[in-house]
Amino acid sequence: MTKPLGMNSSFNVARPDFALIAAWVKPGSKVLDLGCGDGSLIRFLRDSRGARGYGVEIDDANVLACFNNGVNVIQSDLESGLQSFESGSFDYVVLSQTLQAVKNTENIIKEMLRVSKEGIVSFPNFGYWKNRLQVLSGHMPVSEALPYQWFDTPNIHNCTLGDFEEFCGQHGAHILERRVMSGNHQIRFMPNLLGMLAFYRFEQQK
């Protein structure tokens, strides 16, 4: 979920994770971004992959920013916004750094796979070693990926890589590809301990 734009702000510079997501999107694909913020990801996919993009966003300021920047957006809560789409409407549905704030995780993943061929999610890895140290010291983690204090955080379902992969196995989601990052570096060794952000591409179990 990207940050809101002010009325006089220029369009957000693409986040480093956008390039990773774009690498998984085939040129010319139809993409839906849930909780799209100001539409930065959709615009990046349109410009870099020729994607036909749409967003779902509830915040008034972000919806206006999407319109001002030529991004198609539907104003709706992301957890109910998928109900208006027919099955197989998209090639990809993206949930970028928002999974941990979703109330009904099971339903959102199910709906993502109903309306698209593939789902793409990214989320902060709660098993990251710095998070573990903060918990060990008696505090909830606060970091670049988890910037909120315990009392004002929207994050209600933090998880680790192992948690998400177990969830997928139990809910009919077949993982096609995984990338784990710390800053701009891909983590291959002990990713559940050393990785800050996790990215998954998945499809309905066949």
Predicted regions mapped to residue ranges:
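Short conserved loop adjoining the S-adenosyl-L-methionine
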Residues: 81-87
